[in-house]
UniProtKB/Swiss-Prot annotation:
GO terms for MF: hydroxymethylglutaryl-CoA reductase (NADPH) activity
Keywords: Isoprene biosynthesis, NADP, Oxidoreductase
Biological source species: Pyrococcus horikoshii (strain ATCC 700860 / DSM 12428 / JCM 9974 / NBRC 100139 / OT-3)
Enzyme class: oxidoreductase
Designated name of the protein: 3-hydroxy-3-methylglutaryl-coenzyme A reductase
SUPFAM superfamilies per record: NAD-binding domain of HMG-CoA reductase, Substrate-binding domain of HMG-CoA reductase
GO biological process: coenzyme A metabolic process; isoprenoid biosynthetic process; sterol biosynthetic process
Reaction it catalyzes: (R)-mevalonate + 2 NADP(+) + CoA = (3S)-3-hydroxy-3-methylglutaryl-CoA + 2 NADPH + 2 H(+)
């Protein structure tokens, strides 16, 4: 029985005809979120005259997700997940051989990344280097004029420790304010705060902390007005130049030297052709297109890993930013690298709590918080970068060998 005098069928009927809203269902079933999920789905089936059998088939517990990861839940969407690897990584945090979980419906993608992993591992592995690690939020403050905006910006730059103590430490144990980059446009001040966020991707953390900072600034400067918690200079979930240049999340590089014999044997092409394709496709072609993605397909690998591991899928946008370099070494081998300026990932919080996504993180040995905090997310970043390099190498080789269409005919239909 449901809440009040209604039985389950009556609740379904009332949801289907709109008398009970989707978000109200839990109130009628004593807070049972699994039952509420079933009712919403059955009501939708009834209203639309369809069956949602596969959406209703799942193992995760709605009671653990509703109110944290999802609202108005009706079930799940299942995405096939494959694994590529092993990939040998010689990183500062990721050391050893790793398998890469990839959730995708694009045929040939996993096979291509797997081929890249095989070639790179045979070549001795990938060297990964973490260049920077920060999450940003850029509130917007309205000032009387540009000079006042400059004064406020200077005060903020000189009082980061004070703001950490009076604002940030009040709302987070893991967040650390490490810097700020002010932008002034007319009488508008955009403060691009930079935070350390441990193993969390950190958007919730830095958003809450930034709001506390705004309260302190308004107390210090009564003539300015905090207008928006995000002034779009963060920049979150949009293609942009700021993240490409200054970075956001993890800035990471993966590189390798692949001997000529491996390029010819495994990849069926030459270092010269791969370098030529990369230059005229990824660099010249991308420049002509006005793209921030000077690469072949970062987004394919980033997207598949994000979906598998519970990352914020909208941040695939920034993960697609980056540059691939390929050149022939003096010895005639292939040097190849990828630079990712804004890889926004975490191993705790958000979708990483979903059991299947947590298991995908466990495949790489990065589930949950690290000791010390932050080490798991850094390791994860190096693994992602290595996988992206594998994907770039394989696709560039396929294009150079004119095998791309053939591969998609075989595996992608």
């Amino acid at each position: 029985m449901g809440g009040g005098n209604l039985n389950i069928e009556e609740i379904i009927e009332k949801v289907a005809n709109g008398e009970i809203k989707f978000y109200q269902v839990e109130k009628y079933v004593n807070g049972d979120k699994r039952l509420a999920t079933e009712i919403r789905r059955k009501a939708l089936e009834k209203r639309l005259g369809i069956k949602l059998h596969h959406i209703g088939y799942y193992s995760i517990d709605p009671n653990e997700l509703i109110g944290r990861n999802i609202e108005n839940m009706i079930g799940v969407v299942q995405i096939p997940m494959g694994v590529a690897g092993p990939l040998k990584i010689n990183g500062e945090y990721a050391k050893g051989e790793f398998y890469i979980p990839l959730a995708t419906t694009e045929g040939a993608l996993v096979a291509s990344v797997n081929r890249g992993c095989s070639a790179l591992t045979e070549a001795g592995g990938v060297v990964t280097t973490l260049i920077d690690d920060k999450m940003t939020r850029a509130p917007l403050i309205r000032c009387p004029n540009a000079r006042r905006a400059r004064e406020v910006a200077k005060w903020v730059e000189e009082n980061l420790d004070y703001l950490q103590e009076k604002a940030v430490s009040k709302v987070t144990r893991h967040g650390k304010l490490r810097g700020v980059k002010p932008f002034i446009v007319g009488n508008n001040l955009y403060l691009r705060f930079e935070f350390e966020t441990g193993d969390a991707m950190g958007m919730n953390m830095v958003t809450i902390a930034s709001e506390e900072i705004m309260k302190v600034i308004e107390e210090e400067f009564p003539d300015v007005r905090y207008l928006a918690l995000s002034g779009n200079l963060c920049v979150d979930k949009k293609p942009n130049a700021v993240n490409f240049i200054l970075g956001r999340g993890k800035t990471v590089i993966a590189e390798a030297v692949v001997p000529r014999k491996i390029v010819e044997k495994k990849l069926k092409t030459t270092p010269e052709l791969i370098a030529e394709v990369n230059y005229f496709k990824n660099l010249v072609g991308s420049a002509q297109a006005g793209s921030y993605g000077f690469n072949a397909h970062f987004a394919n690998i980033v997207g598949a890993i994000f979906l598998a591991t519970g990352q914020d899928e909208a941040q695939i946008t920034e993960g697609a930013h980056g540059i691939t370099i390929a050149e022939v070494t003096p010895d005639g081998d292939l040097y190849i690298s990828i630079t990712m300026p804004s890889l926004e990932i975490g191993t705790v919080g958000g979708g990483t709590r979903v059991p299947s996504q947590r298991e995908a993180l466990e495949i790489m040995g990065v589930a949950g918080g690290g000791d010390p905090p932050g080490i798991n997310a850094k390791k994860f970043a190096e693994i992602v970068a290595g996988a992206v390099l594998a994907g770039e190498l394989s696709l560039l080789a396929a294009i150079a060998a004119k095998h791309l269409a053939r591969a998609h005919k075989m595996l992608g239909r």
